[in-house]
From Swiss-Prot:
The gene is betI. InterPro entries: BetI_C, DNA-bd_HTH_TetR-type_CS, Homeodomain-like_sf, HTH-type_TetR-like_transc_reg, HTH_TetR, Tet_transcr_reg_TetR-rel_C_sf, Tscrpt_rep_BetI. It comes from Escherichia coli (strain SE11). GO terms for molecular function: DNA-binding transcription factor activity; transcription cis-regulatory region binding. Residues 31-50 bind DNA. The lineage of its organism: Bacteria, Pseudomonadati, Pseudomonadota, Gammaproteobacteria, Enterobacterales. The keyword NAD does not apply. GO terms for biological process: glycine betaine biosynthetic process from choline; negative regulation of DNA-templated transcription. Keywords: DNA-binding, Repressor, Transcription, Transcription regulation. Gene3D superfamilies: Tetracycline Repressor, domain 2 (1.10.357.10). This is HTH-type transcriptional regulator BetI. Repressor involved in the biosynthesis of the osmoprotectant glycine betaine. It represses transcription of the choline transporter BetT and the genes of BetAB involved in the synthesis of glycine betaine. Pathway: Amine and polyamine biosynthesis; betaine biosynthesis via choline pathway [regulation]. It comes from the Bacteria.
């Protein structure tokens, strides 16, 4: 009989092992056997919890997108009366949270984006994440700008966030957070009306 609470512990172990494997060998070269070995479990455990490698990869990406959502929401909840500028900076901060810019997370996101073009479930996850970012940004810009300008500013800031993140991911170096925050802050202040 399985121990109570083991499922969440095992799932966490396997997701962490998947991130480690992707970080070291890439998504395509990460095998079920390697992941199981890293997690200290049998390959049958992966099949039991996730069906197959694709199920495990999907769960890993759901976990990373959930961490992104939480990083943004935690910052926004801390600013219930914050200005549009403060709340936009909170969204930026959530996207540059350590859970999103660690080497393992960045490599997993890159692999996820590439795979999402060919796997419908990953594509849906990618679309939800992308739409959530844009919706959050537009909503905050909308507090100060007409709809069309808010949509353009939101799209521009989303592109800047993604671009800064992508440049860091492809450089193999850590994200320069002070520079990223400076550039995004400048973009935000350029697009919000001055008092």
């Amino acid at each position: 009989m399985p121990k109570l609470g083991m499922q969440s512990i095992r799932r966490r172990q396997l997701i962490d092992a998947t991130l480690e494997a992707i970080n070291e060998v890439g998504m395509h070269d990460a095998t079920i056997a390697q992941i199981a070995r890293r997690a200290g479990v049998s390959t049958g455990i992966i099949s039991h919890y996730f069906r197959d490698k694709n199920g495990l990869l999907e769960a890993t990406m759901r976990d990373i997108t959930s961490q992104l959502r939480d990083a943004v929401l935690n910052r926004l909840h801390a600013l219930p009366q914050g200005s549009a500028e403060q709340r936009l900076q909170a969204i930026v901060g959530g996207n540059f949270d350590e859970t999103q810019v660690s080497s393992a997370a960045m490599k997993a996101w890159l692999a996820f984006w590439a795979s999402s073009m060919h796997q419908p479930m990953l594509y849906r996850l990618q679309q939800v994440s992308s739409r959530r970012l844009l919706s959050n940004l537009v909503s905050e810009f909308r507090r100060e700008l007409p709809r069309e300008q808010a949509q353009e500013a939101g799209y521009g800031l989303a592109a800047l966030i993604d671009g800064l993140w992508l440049r860091a991911a492809l450089s193999g170096k850590p994200l320069d957070k002070p520079l990223a925050h400076s550039l995004t802050r400048h973009f935000i202040t350029q697009h919000l009306p001055t008092d």
